[in-house]
Amino acid sequence: MKLSMKSLAALLMMLNGAVMASENVNTPENRQFLKQQENLSRQLREKPDHQLKAWAEKQVLENPLQRSDNHFLDELVRKQQASQDGKPRQGALYFVSFSIPEEGLKRMLGETRHFGIPATLRGMVNNDLKTTAEAVLSLVKDGATDGVQIDPTLFSQYGIRTVPALVVFCSQGYDIIRGNLRVGQALEKVAATGDCRQVAHDLLAGKGDSGK
């Protein structure tokens, strides 16, 4: 299996994502780390590092992925490209973790998919790509991983230290609803009193834009 430079950048982002796994994510050290990863990804796209690419290919060969796992990685690469093309100005994100009991996590992923809201994880399971892919695929219905993303920077951006948490964002700012509520109930709270109430109304009506 050969890695494109875009795939390599995504793989490095995921491998390093576990550094953000502590609860105290919004620290100078973590912000500096994220900036370094952003610079590294840009450098890899502009000037390929063949030695680093060879190392990553060796990791993939020694830890082969199943077809479903490859699809999971492809989805992550696609989402990374989309986020680089331009972030949406409004939408919602639902922050979860594998520390949530499986039954509850399955329900949450089903609800976020229903509303078109990305379920956002901080990092990988045991810092391992294959284990993470298998864990996600065991939770989602019909292998549909399109509603799941891994992005530790979003946890830092919105100051998310406990999960689950819903973030609805818009040009006026963002609203955060914390706690184990149904996704629909959390959206209703934002729709009632939030700064981004119109976005929440649209999501409840099935015509909102999901965040990336």
Curated annotation (Swiss-Prot):
Protein's cellular compartments: Periplasm
InterPro entries found in the cross-reference section: T4SS_TrbC (IPR019106), T4SS_TrbC_subgr (IPR014113)
One cellular-component annotation, GO: periplasmic space
UniProt keyword annotation of Transmembrane present: no
Parts forming coiled coils: none
Keywords, sorted A to Z: Conjugation, Periplasm, Plasmid, Signal
Signal peptide stretch: 1-21
NCBIfam families for this protein: PRK13730.1 (NF010290), TrbC_Ftype (TIGR02742)
Free-text function comment from the UniProt entry: Essential for F plasmid conjugative transfer, participates in F-pilus assembly.
Listed name of the protein: Periplasmic protein TrbC
Organism of provenance: Escherichia coli (strain K12)
Lineage: Bacteria, Pseudomonadati, Pseudomonadota, Gammaproteobacteria, Enterobacterales
